[in-house]
From Swiss-Prot:
Keywords: Acyltransferase, Cell shape, Cell wall biogenesis/degradation, Cytoplasm, Magnesium, Metal-binding, Multifunctional enzyme, Nucleotidyltransferase, Peptidoglycan synthesis, Repeat, Transferase. This is Bifunctional protein GlmU. InterPro entries: Bifunctional_GlmU, GlmU-like, GlmU_C_LbH, Hexapep, Hexapep_transf_CS, MobA-like_NTP_Trfase, Nucleotide-diphossugar_trans, Trimer_LpxA-like_sf. Residues 227-247 are annotated as: Linker. It comes from the Bacteria. Catalyzes the last two sequential reactions in the de novo biosynthetic pathway for UDP-N-acetylglucosamine (UDP-GlcNAc). The C-terminal domain catalyzes the transfer of acetyl group from acetyl coenzyme A to glucosamine-1-phosphate (GlcN-1-P) to produce N-acetylglucosamine-1-phosphate (GlcNAc-1-P), which is converted into UDP-GlcNAc by the transfer of uridine 5-monophosphate (from uridine 5-triphosphate), a reaction catalyzed by the N-terminal domain. The lineage of its organism: Bacteria, Pseudomonadati, Pseudomonadota, Gammaproteobacteria, Vibrionales. Its cofactor is Mg(2+). Its main location: cytoplasm. Residues 248-452 are annotated as: N-acetyltransferase. It catalyses: alpha-D-glucosamine 1-phosphate + acetyl-CoA = N-acetyl-alpha-D-glucosamine 1-phosphate + CoA + H(+); N-acetyl-alpha-D-glucosamine 1-phosphate + UTP + H(+) = UDP-N-acetyl-alpha-D-glucosamine + diphosphate.
Amino acid sequence: MNFSAVILAAGKGTRMYSNKPKVLHTLAGKPMAKHVIDTCEGLGAQNIHLVYGHGGDQMKAELGEERVQWVLQAEQLGTGHAVNQAAPEFADDEKVLVLYGDVPLISAETVENLLDAQPTGGIALLTVVLDNPMGYGRIIRRNGPVIAIVEQKDATEEQKLIKEINTGVMVATGGDLKRWLAALKNENAQGEYYLTDIIAAAHDEGRAVEAVHPVSPIEVEGVNDRAQLARLERAYQAAQAQKLLEQGVMLRDPSRFDLRGTLQCGMDIEIDANVIIEGNVTLGDNVIIGAGCVLKDCEIDDNTVIRPYSVIEGATVGEECTVGPFTRLRPGAELCNDAHVGNFVEVKNVRLGEGSKANHLTYLGDAEIGKRVNVGAGVITCNYDGANKFKTIIGDDVFVGSDSQLIAPVTVANGATVGAGSTVTKDVNENELYISRAKERRIANWQRPTKK
């Protein structure tokens, strides 16, 4: 579909009480403006013009300078003035869609309906009927067709009774839009150039104005404060949870589940309460995710159990594995099939071989660990000397006793045993027992020191 979009995002967001531009506050882990940009890109917008004012450098850094055409509105003189800043870039014959960076839930389906509804030479306008329309511009109709929009502060008492309101989202042809914008005046209670005044201008020229309703009213709710943002967050999460339930995912408590990215699921998935999904996550068949887990940019294969309060980021977990509770898998962690990682174990940039176990109180970093290895409680791979990181290599069928330290770079060969409490500074040979302990001393009749 041949269209360009203008996203208005110049507001300061005073009621957010934040140094951050309002449209950079996140919904589902993503800036509000990015939701709108993604929707436009998904529909194939030819150009996306983002009108900004406050915090431009920060917005460009977070949203990406290359994704949109940045248009500065140095003074905030109204919505019509904002769109007019981008008007020189409009092609005369293209559809121009006006959206808002603080209205993040607008759906592709609603936008498509609006674009399709634009009459030739006219305007398609997104409206909604509210029980309490206070504060919104009212839709004025004459015998059915829309003829104007009147803002709350300019409305008569009779007009204030109208419940159909303007969402601000509209489509017009570029050439017409440029002409109407150039003719706007600021003779109103706000002293601003209202975009809504182009509706009356179109009507005066005999152009049709078509009103379209969104698929869901929540799509056109804007954000002016943190309470409204929290409301939209919950609405978004409820919708995501409902989709997953319909796809066969068992969410034990849909109201306590957050999807802040994308989730691909196999069959018979169970997800307990207070689980957060971030980035791109893939779950195989028969995966169980315990309560309070955070999964980010990871892949978990079939028949694996992630026990409660585990944090997994940038990791891959094989089939038939058990992780947690209270495990942290950091980027580069790879658990092969039937691996077990237990409570208070941290794994970073490690390949843990098939059938290997680290069940308690362990740090494994920058290591290659073979098959059927048992790593005892309190074991640490000492991978960092304060300046550089080094690798630990552990072969197959190795037993590393509790409270041992492996000082990298070091290799423990196949079948070796490291006795509990050892500090390993040199390579251990195959099938060798390595013990490194201080000499035991016993002092009979020992007298403890007393305070003086």
